[in-house]
Every structure is written in C-alpha cells, then in structure tokens.
Amino acid sequence: GDKGISATRKEDGKRFHFPGEGGVMRIEADGSGFEVFARGLRNPQELAFDEYGNLFTVDNDGDFGDRERFVFIVEGSDSGWRANHQYRKRDHNQWLAEKLWKPAEEDQPAFLLPPISNYSAGPAGFAYNPGTALGERHRKHFFLAHSTKQTTAITTDPDGASFKMTGEHQVLKGLFVIGINFGPDGALYGADWVNIPWDPHMN
C-alpha cells in the first residue's frame, strides 16, 4: 500500500515511522527482527525476485498524467512517493516538479532511487519465471498483469548498479488478470477479475 508504516520492534523498542509511504518490510519467520527494507513506493502490487535474488516491483502512478514505475528495490532505498503528493495541485506538487516518477535524470533529488522505467497501465499481478517449464522463450522473464486486460513478459539486463528493461511482448489479452503466480509444476496461474466493474468502495 502507500498509506504509511508505523511499527515498533518488540526486541529493542526501535520505532519505524514513515507516514504516507508504501514500503517493503522484512521479518523473520518467528515474527522477530522487523525492519523496513525499502520505502517511498506507491501501492506496489506484488514483489518478485530474479534468480540472483534481486528484488523488483511495479508500483502505481499518482493520477496526474504521470506513469507507473518498474522499480529495482535496494535495501535502504527511497523511491520518492509520499501520500500527500496525491492531494496537492499540479502547480505545487513535488512529485511532478522534481520528476520523482521518472527514470534517472540529472536534476532529480539525490535521495531518490529512480525507477528502471515507466511501464504499464494499472499494474496488478507480477511474478518472475523461476524455471524452464514455459520454454526457452520465456526464461528469465518477469510477467506483469495490467488492468487493461493484458499480460506482458519483460526482461532486464544489468546497467551499472541498477538494471534496464530490454524486452517486452504480450502473452495474454482479454482477461482481467489481477494476480499471477507460478505453481510447483512450473505453470503460470492467474486470478481473473472477470467483467465486474472496479469500485473502490465495493464491499
């Protein structure tokens, strides 16, 4: 989400307080060791590791004519989103004025970890192909379900200390897939929203 993080670690009382930010938290299986791994994300839908343990997500835009972001998540990183950006007008909005939603540019703030690219329209399901069951064509691909009723496959290559998006093709069209995952058999499964209109106030 992106409404904020506020938690106190039980073992030592350390407080993690990041109001108005989405983030990635890390915790041990027994509930200990809570920490905020990365922050400043705008409602990321799912996280995915590649085969080397690099972590990625696709988060949402601010509905200002900006674009969704394909993000490489680094420990300690800040991707720039604050919930109050969404409630400010265009003529005084840090999100737009400082280009926090765009890939790396020289005049962006130094604290920002810029996205790899601007990509997708309403990201939903996101997963990385962990094996070979889908054939050679789809090895080392991320799969992303869009709210525009299409699912695409994308690839990345290292680019300095980050990555660049190097390929994309459509693998499915016409189904409103909102979640995807790989099963133990190596197949890719999706959950379909069908044709129910999206309503943020739906019970």
Regions found by a protein language model. Name each.
Residues 1-203:
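Beta-propeller domains with acidic blade repeats across secreted/periplasmic ectodomains
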